[in-house]
Amino acid sequence: MDADWATRYGRPVRLPSRPSHTVTRLKQAGADAHQLLQSLPSHRRAPRAEALRQIMVQNFLVDARGVLRSRTEKDGRPKGAVRVISPYDPDARQAIRGNTRWNGYLVHVTETCDADARVNLITDIVTTSPIRDAQALPGIHTRLARRGLLPTEHLVDGGYTSMVHLERAEREHQVTVNGPLPGNPTRRHRQHEGFDRDDFHIDFDRRQVTCPRGQVSSSWHGLYPTSSPTAAPLIVAKFTKGQCQPCPDRSRCTTSRESARNVGFPPRELRDLQARVRTEQQTPDWKARYTVRSEVEGTINEFTHGHGMRHCLLPRASS
């Protein structure tokens, strides 16, 4: 540090008079922060110094010439789940839900919805970082179990319906989680063209898959973990080039000219659960029960517009 630091950072805000001043000050701030971090032992950095290090990694890099410069989109940026958005609140993250974006946290509200009850009672409310909604389910059920308030059926919106967490809720807490399951994300399924995974017959006992043309897979591999915390691990069945290349329906099955078709699918217990849930969700009884879930939207609306939930600071609880 030198005497010029007091001039540069003694005031909380210094508005630039010219656009070029912003770039100049950004470079100077990056150089100063880099110098400061270089002078601190890496094993003795306090939380604020660690937050500064993260912010520097997000916004600057040292190139091949050893020169510190601003990071661009081409250089890559950390994902929103780990990116620090404010030095004043290093736990806050950017959240995206549909067309809505904000910086901060998520609030998860659970309430009773008994048909014969005169009022609905809030049984759990928690503030988390903007994780996927399904990741909040285990913590919600753990807290409800601790209070003796676990329901037999938990109605949720589509953001909470991960097959992994639905199975876990049944296994660990005997809670049936009901909500719209996400559809098949593959291009073939969306465009209703070609053969997608559901067109293949899976025989778990024989560890083989049969394609719509009657060819049987040559190998069975997995389980393979996925990068998403809400996605199920996958088994992958593979066909050979000798099976796929002569097939008259090849263009409907794979877009690759060289390789053969692979089929990925979840383990038996998750696939059976998925099939059962999707069948149940087509019944009038399930649809009638699920309409009750919309009542919690009124509670969230009251929190938002009546109590300033989107602007007040809430205590955060770990799931």
Regions inferred by a protein language model and the residue ranges of each:
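Anion-binding and metal-coordination hotspots
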Residues: 1-319
